[in-house]
Every structure is written in structure tokens, then in C-alpha cells.
């Protein structure tokens, strides 16, 4: 294979240069931090409901069937089981159901309930749980709830990692205490630091809340949740009990899946027992979306026109990768994504959509896509807001009709943007969970509109089309899979 187009070589060299410069910067920072005094013991915020910015949600109907009936069932399950997994669609009131369940538990206990809430940082910053609990307390003044703390997975991990603050947290939760885990799928890897830290609190009953508990590696996902439920003490313990260790492949995954994604139960019959165990912790009620006053969603799949220059540039990138000009497969895949998202036809279509809607949400993955979109918006005199990893959600102007750029990883979950009538999935990415979470940012109860439009932009190139199709089928794609796709479809 040869390439007369120098695009791939130029990009590979530019990435290598940037990495060298960043490496030097990191080395200097590391050098200057050598004599930094270690951090003190993490502080647990125990006065979370006194925040003056808390505003009780006024749209929650605590008497509707979805909230009261499901909340009662969840509360009973939480009392009887070490682990309960509540699965409900994004925006359908999972938080309200969970809070109602806590209220029912408190009635059963006959005294103030001890519980903590773990939620993504954007949810904590946005006071989502605070506002829901405050709304419950206003509706039920004789049965008010007061969480011991509301914290993030990262902060909880730091607290548990320190022996003194770990003991303080255990004492704070107390006997018969409960742990509420929002966006439970953040703990789907049983060997991650956050999961291992949470395992140290396995003596407490837990409620995990998510719309997307299982990915295409459902066995590992279920393993993680069952460890939280006390069915297994660790991943190794699960592998020993189930006999699945002999199916481990070179990447550490389990080679027990058929071509259609189903588990090969003939080779690994233990899967039936695992399913029975998972059903014991799972509660996935049917939800009448119409009764929740949620908007209808109209989806638009936008197949973009062919761009011969883009296709040529992608082939040039592939040539550079085969010549090993990229330091890693990650660098190559990012370069491919960046070229696709900088396609002028894609950017022009984006502008046409943005001009038709109020507060359109524009989802992107990599910073290069963000920069390309911002440049195009500025070119057309369109102001914008940005939600990325460093954004304080309180700074977002919810009343503005300007488009909001949202990074999938930073803002796909636990953010409510109820004035928006449009979502544009500008950049296709590799996670089905991120896609589902992104869809729910403006499809929620008590919206300002009865109809929300979702746009999916797909370039006329095999790689982008395959990426869209596989993620929409529910797959979570690793770099190894993406590399195979790039080899086949570019």
C-alpha cells in the first residue's frame, strides 16, 4: 500500500511533536512536586442539606404510580437484600423513586434513617439529589430525610483509602445504614480503584441506580454488581466458583460469547446460575412514559454527502499507521476521529440544524471536534456554552437558547437541560452507555417542550457508519475492536 497524500504523515509527526512537548511539561511539573507535603486526611462533608442554593423540585408528583408504587417495592427490597439494582429509563424519575424508597424505609425503621449518596460530580454540583430530597421533605414534613453525606465516587475512594477517614465513614453510616449509588454502571469494572474502595463498605445494604447496567461484556458487569451484593467476595472468587477462568483470552476478557453476542451456555452452563443471581438483585419496573409528562422524541439519521478529500486523508492516515508512524493505536484512532469531525460537510449540516432549534445540545468526544465546532459557530456569529470535565454546572445559563457543547464523558450523565428541544450527536463514539445517557439530557419530566429532536450525523465512510451501527446495537467498543474496524473499513 502506498499513499501520495501526505496528510497521514503530517498528522502523525504533529501528534508526536505535541506528545514530546507535553512529556517535557509533565516532567517539569513532576520535578517541582517532589517535596510536596502529602495531603491531609480527607474531610467528609456532613452538612450537605444546609446549602442555600438548594431548591426543592416542584414537578415531582409523589403520589403517581411510577414513584409511589415502585418506591415502596424498592424500599422493601432494600430492607431485605444487601444489594438492589434499580433500572429505569433515563429521565423517568429514578432519583425520585429512590428517595421515596428511603422515606418508606425510614417509616419501617421508626427512627431517622442513616444513608449516604454517591453520585457523579456534575450531579453533586447541580444539587440533583439535594433538590429531590428537599422536595420530599416539603411534601412529607413528618418524615423528613437527612443524608449523612452526598459525595462523588472519586471523593469516596479517597476517604476509604485513608484509614482514619475510612473508619469515620463507617461510623457515620452506622448500624443499619444504607448506601445509594447513582449511575451504578460507573462501578461495572470490579477491579477498578473506585470499585475496590466501595467493596470495603460491603457490610452495608446498597441501592444502585442506572438506566444502563449491562454492556456487551454483561458477564463482567453482572460479576461486579454481584460482588456488591455479597454473592462473591472478588473477581477472582467469581472466576474460581464459576469456572470461567479457563475461558480468559489474551486481553483478559472472557471468550464465552458467540458471534451474535450471546453467551455460549453449552460451553459455560454456569451462566444460568449467574442470571438467577442477577435477577435476585435487579428491579426493572415497566414505566408509562406518557404518565410522566415526558416529551416525544423524533430521531433524524443524517447521512452526509461523500467527501473525496476526507476519504483520501483517512487512507493516508491508515498508510501512516501501517508504516508505524503513530506512537500508539490510540493516537491513530484519535487522528481518524479528528479528520471525520473536521469534515466541512459535517460542520455545514450542524449549522443548519443549530439555526432551527432552541438550546441545541451538541455532543462531542475529543477536543479537536469541540474546537472545530466552536470555530464554525464563531464564523456564523453563534454564541455557545460549554460543558466539559472542568465545567462547574452552576455556571451554565439554563435560560439561554444558545447551543451547549457537551463532552460525552463529562456531561452525558446526570445533567438536566429542560429548555432544550434538540440534541445533535455530532461525533460518533465507542460507548453505548454514553449514547444512552446523552439521549436523556433533554428527555425528562416537566420539559418546556412536547417534542425533542435527536440528530445523528454519519459520514459517508465505512468506519463512521460501522461505528454508529455497532454502538446503536448496544456495544462498548475497545481500542482493539476499533483498530480492526479501521483496518476493514478505511
Show which residues each predicted segment covers.
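Conserved helicase ATPase core of P-loop NTP-dependent helicases/translocases
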Residues: 382-407
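Conserved pre-motif I regulatory segment
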Residues: 40-85
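A conserved SF2-helicase RecA2
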Residues: 443-490
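Conserved helicase/translocase motor-coupling segment
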Residues: 291-376
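Walker A/P-loop
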Residues: 82-100
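Conserved Walker A/P-loop ATP-binding site and its immediately adjacent core
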Residues: 95-97, 112-133, 366
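Conserved SF2 helicase motif VI
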Residues: 431-447
Amino acid at each position: 500500500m502506498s499513499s501520495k497524500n501526505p496528510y497521514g504523515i503530517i498528522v502523525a509527526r504533529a501528534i508526536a511533536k505535541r506528545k514530546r512537548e507535553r512529556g517535557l511539561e509533565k516532567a517539569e511539573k513532576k520535578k517541582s512536586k517532589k517535596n510536596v507535603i502529602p495531603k491531609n486526611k480527607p474531610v467528609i462533608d456532613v452538612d450537605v442539606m444546609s446549602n442555600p442554593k438548594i431548591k426543592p423540585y416542584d414537578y415531582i408528583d409523589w403520589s403517581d404510580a411510577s414513584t409511589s408504587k415502585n418506591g415502596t417495592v424498592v424500599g422493601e427490597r432494600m430492607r431485605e437484600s444487601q444489594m438492589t439494582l434499580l433500572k429505569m429509563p433515563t429521565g423517568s424519575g429514578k432519583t425520585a423513586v429512590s428517595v421515596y424508597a428511603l422515606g418508606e424505609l425510614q417509616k419501617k425503621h421508626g427512627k431517622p434513617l442513616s444513608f449516604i449518596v454517591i453520585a457523579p460530580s456534575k450531579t453533586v454540583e447541580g444539587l440533583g439529589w439535594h433538590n429531590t430530597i428537599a422536595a420530599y421533605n416539603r411534601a412529607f414534613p413528618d418524615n423528613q430525610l437527612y443524608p449523612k453525606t452526598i459525595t462523588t465516587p472519586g471523593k469516596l475512594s479517597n476517604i476509604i483509602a485513608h484509614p482514619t477517614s475510612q473508619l469515620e465513614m463507617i461510623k457515620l453510616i452506622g448500624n443499619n445504614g444504607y448506601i445509594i449509588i447513582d449511575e451504578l454502571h460507573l462501578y461495572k469494572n470490579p477491579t477498578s480503584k473506585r470499585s475496590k474502595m466501595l467493596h470495603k463498605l460491603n457490610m452495608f445494604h446498597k441501592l444502585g441506580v442506572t438506566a444502563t447496567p449491562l454492556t456487551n461484556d454483561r458477564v463482567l458487569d453482572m460479576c461486579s454488581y454481584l460482588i456488591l451484593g455479597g454473592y462473591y467476595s472478588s473477581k477472582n472468587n467469581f472466576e474460581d466458583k464459576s469456572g470461567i477462568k479457563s475461558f480468559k483470552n489474551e486481553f483478559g476478557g472472557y471468550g464465552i460469547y458467540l458471534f451474535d453476542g450471546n453467551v455460549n451456555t453449552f460451553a459455560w452452563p454456569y451462566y444460568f446460575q449467574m442470571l438467577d443471581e442477577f435477577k435476585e438483585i435487579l428491579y426493572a419496573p415497566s414505566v408509562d412514559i406518557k404518565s410522566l409528562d415526558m416529551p416525544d422524541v423524533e430521531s433524524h439519521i443524517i447521512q452526509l454527502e461523500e467527501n473525496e478529500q476526507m476519504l483520501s486523508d483517512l487512507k493516508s492516515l491508515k498508510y501512516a499507521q501501517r508504516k508505524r508512524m503513530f506512537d500508539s493505536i490510540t493516537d491513530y484512532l484519535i487522528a481518524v476521529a479528528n479528520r471525520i469531525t473536521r469534515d466541512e460537510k459535517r460542520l455545514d449540516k450542524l449549522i443548519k440544524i443549530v439555526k432551527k432549534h432552541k438550546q441545541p445540545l451538541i455532543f462531542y468526544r475529543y477536543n479537536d471536534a469541540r474546537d472545530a465546532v466552536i470555530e464554525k459557530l464563531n464564523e456564523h456569529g453563534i454564541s455557545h456554552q460549554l460543558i466539559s470535565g472542568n465545567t462547574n454546572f452552576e455556571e451554565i445559563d439554563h435560560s439561554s437558547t444558545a447551543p451547549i457543547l457537551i463532552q460525552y464523558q463529562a456531561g452525558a450523565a446526570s445533567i438536566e437541560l429542560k429548555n432544550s428541544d434538540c440534541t445533535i450527536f455530532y461525533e460518533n463514539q465507542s460507548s453505548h452507555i454514553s449514547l444512552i445517557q446523552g439521549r436523556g439530557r433533554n428527555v425528562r419530566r416537566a420539559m418546556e417542550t412536547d417534542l425533542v429532536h435527536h440528530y445523528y450525523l454519519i459520514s459517508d465512510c465505512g468506519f463512521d457508519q460501522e461505528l454508529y451501527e455497532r454502538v446503536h446495537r448496544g456495544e462498548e467498543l475497545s481500542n482493539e475492536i476499533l483498530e480492526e474496524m479501521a483496518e476493514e473499513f478505511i
